[in-house]
Amino acid sequence: MAAPTAAALSTLSTASVTSGKRFITSSFSLSFSSRPLATGVRAAGARAARRSAASASTVVATIAVGDKLPDATLSYFDPADGELKTVTVAELTAGRKAVLFAVPGAFTPTCSQKHLPGFIEKAGELHAKGVDAIACVSVNDAFVMRAWKESLGLGDADVLLLSDGNLELTRALGVEMDLSDKPMGLGVRSRRYALLADDGVVKVLNLEEGGAFTTSSAEEMLKAL
């Protein structure tokens, strides 16, 4: 099947990407694991260790070049109809080259002034080098992401702004960082990164340390292509 156009990708309205699934409010049921208690304790210990590592200065991630991206559900407001919808990582990356970059937070200075604008500016060059989809991911909720997009006057910019509000993708990649000790009230966020996936397999991974912005720019991604 032919790769969708950049314009189609920007609204996720192509045949290869599910036309969008509206959020449906429903009750949830509790489920209980049958794993032995010791296994659960070990898992909890591992999670605690990873959280501790994530708050340290050294970058620790469970994703690496050559790995298949974990699937996760992200949300966004479809500019075509204004509806709140979801898309999975698999839908974004299957059978195409996709650039995903993450910012610690919408409306924060570096993210608003450099990181996101850089990818918007270089979107055409990235597409010319074979990139089919470009998406910005943040742990902010979809309402904040929409407001951020509107505040920057992005309109139909060829970069998707996706919410990972439950940190599903962020934690699956092992790139969460705990900023609870900072005065800004940011809590747990995603490290700044940019990756290129080809049919869901990571080919390039530029992961920053702390709040740095050195290797995850659009310019650095262009150099890697």
From Swiss-Prot:
Q: Where are the transmembrane segments?
A: none
| Catalytic activity field | [glutaredoxin]-dithiol + a hydroperoxide = [glutaredoxin]-disulfide + an alcohol + H2O
Report the InterPro entries cross-referenced here.
PRX5-like (IPR037944), Redoxin (IPR013740), Thioredoxin-like_sf (IPR036249), Thioredoxin_domain (IPR013766)
Q: Main location per UniProt?
A: plastid
* Transit peptide feature range: 1-42
- Cited Pfam families: Redoxin
Active site positions, chain numbering = 111 (cysteine sulfenic acid (-soh) intermediate)
The source's domain of life comes to: Eukaryota
Q: EC number(s)? A: 1.11.1.25
- Which biological processes are named by the entry's GO terms? cell redox homeostasis; cellular response to oxidative stress; hydrogen peroxide catabolic process
Q: What keywords appear on the UniProt entry?
A: Antioxidant, Chloroplast, Oxidoreductase, Peroxidase, Plastid, Redox-active center, Transit peptide
Per the record, what is one GO cellular component?
cytoplasm
State the compartments where it is located.
Plastid, Chloroplast stroma
What terms describe the molecular function in GO for this protein?
A: thioredoxin peroxidase activity
Q: Which residues form the Thioredoxin domain?
A: 63-225
Describe the protein's quaternary organization and the partners it interacts with.
Answer: Monomer.
Miscellaneous field: The active site is a conserved redox-active cysteine residue, the peroxidatic cysteine (C(P)), which makes the nucleophilic attack on the peroxide substrate. The peroxide oxidizes the C(P)-SH to cysteine sulfenic acid (C(P)-SOH), which then reacts with another cysteine residue, the resolving cysteine (C(R)), to form a disulfide bridge. The disulfide is subsequently reduced by an appropriate electron donor to complete the catalytic cycle. In this 1-Cys peroxiredoxin, no C(R) is present and C(P) instead forms a disulfide with a cysteine from another protein or with a small thiol molecule.
What does the similarity note say? Belongs to the peroxiredoxin family. Prx5 subfamily.
Q: What is the recorded function of this protein according to its Swiss-Prot or TrEMBL entry?
A: Thiol-specific peroxidase that catalyzes the reduction of hydrogen peroxide and organic hydroperoxides to water and alcohols, respectively. Plays a role in cell protection against oxidative stress by detoxifying peroxides. May be involved in chloroplast redox homeostasis.
- Quote the protein name from its UniProt record: Peroxiredoxin-2E-2, chloroplastic
Q: Which organism is it from?
A: Oryza sativa subsp. japonica (Rice)
Encoding gene (name): PRXIIE-2
